[in-house]
Amino acid sequence: MTGLRTDKALRDDRIAVDAPLTWVAKSSSKFIAANERVLFFLFLFTLPFVNPWVRGDGVGYYAYLRSTLIDHDLRFEKDYLSANESFVISRADPQGHLLPRMYTKTGYVDNHFSVGPAILWAPVMLAVHGSVLLADRFGSHVAANGYSYPYLLAMALTTACYSFLALFLSIRIAQKYFEAPLTLLATVGIWMASSLPVYTYFNPSWSHALSAFTVALFLWYWERTRLHRTTGQWAILGLVAGLMGNVYYPNVILLIFPALEGVHLLFPRQRDGDPLVVSIQKSALNCGVFVATFFASLIPTFITRWIIYGSPFETGYPAISTWNWTSPVLLKILFSADHGMFSWTPVLILAVVGLPILVKTDTLLGVGSVLTFLAFYYFIASYPDWAGISSFGNRFFVSLTPIFILGLAALLSSFAKWLGRTTRAVAIACPVLALLILWNVGFIFQWGTHMVPARGEISWSRMIHNQFVEVPLRVTHDCETYFTRRGEMMLHIEQEDIDHQEIHGDREN
């Protein structure tokens, strides 16, 4: 019937937007399983670096889970007053009471951090809470208060697992378009040479690694079902999109992908004199289902905003009208000594350069990735606290980890074609990425031990001196301390943070 797209037409249309070529998938199939095993074993090797603590922004994210699970309310006084001292000193008076400014008009404690991380942690934490209560009956006497070690360890390991899933789903997407060795290099390169390790291992209670997972899940499902998605699959995509927004509000920018797909389906290319069109009624139904499930999935955010702020649409962040929309810091956000994305994590330069190449590989995926990055870039550059206050690199862009992996894989693939052999490209790319990873690990070490300030601009001359002189001298001793006397080390780092705040008047987010 006129206006209805057949299955064959859908398959043809997928080819028309440069779907992954069959020869790529076949030539890489024997390496894909090996890729995923390597990624998994690398992940297992890094697990001892997981740091089970709740600190800074993580206090707000974790409070939703702990307060709901243990106290059965959204009263966060206990969470805030029990937090790390550098978090408390700017929020409480000398008598140990939260300052009046910490309360909203509804009488609840201001908690502008998103509820999404608590949703992702909840299944594991419910099991842990039940286990702690059960163990208590047998005389274990572990405090079932959400602060004891089993809870913190479970939270940290859960975050690490979600971070790994972000990488796993990202490499699954990339392997459809590029040769397996190149996708493994791209994935490991972005994983280890970006800001992701800080929010996977050192600060697992923050939202960024979890955000990367939800973006990867959304992109993976969108790519897997695009152009032939059923109404039910549109509903699932809407739910995943809502989860993505619950975890990190700017992630809704990723809706660019289904929007582009919708435009393509409504205005497809004409073939053999027979234009392929989609029923307007069918498109409207799918769009309605997607929007409905998207907003339904956001209900946890709407409810918590309503309770805390009195409106489901109040976020607690600076009003959009106060943002720097007409004067975004487009260069500073990339190159500033104050957590510039490219200056702190230069591997992302390669990833962004690869995004236009991705357009040539697959139009929808490539254009969606480019537009998403540009929109995200402008959005964060317009945000008053664009540098992230306390941040390694520009932490806001950790959400785009899957897109960066695709961009780097596209660049490596183009390089391999230029050289004429994949093995040559791998041989050259491996040492380059290894150097970027070593540089990043040394930089993270400096940042974590406060050899460079966690807030504000750093001195590049001092940082470079540290990389070549101080880091090699200290790394063995400090790593030993991290694994054998971690609590003592964290207290020392916390005290340094307090001293820095008192001197410079800095604040937590």
Q: What is each residue range found by the language model?
A:
Residues 32-39, 133-145, 165-194, 213, ...:
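Transmembrane-helix signature of polytopic, membrane-embedded enzymes
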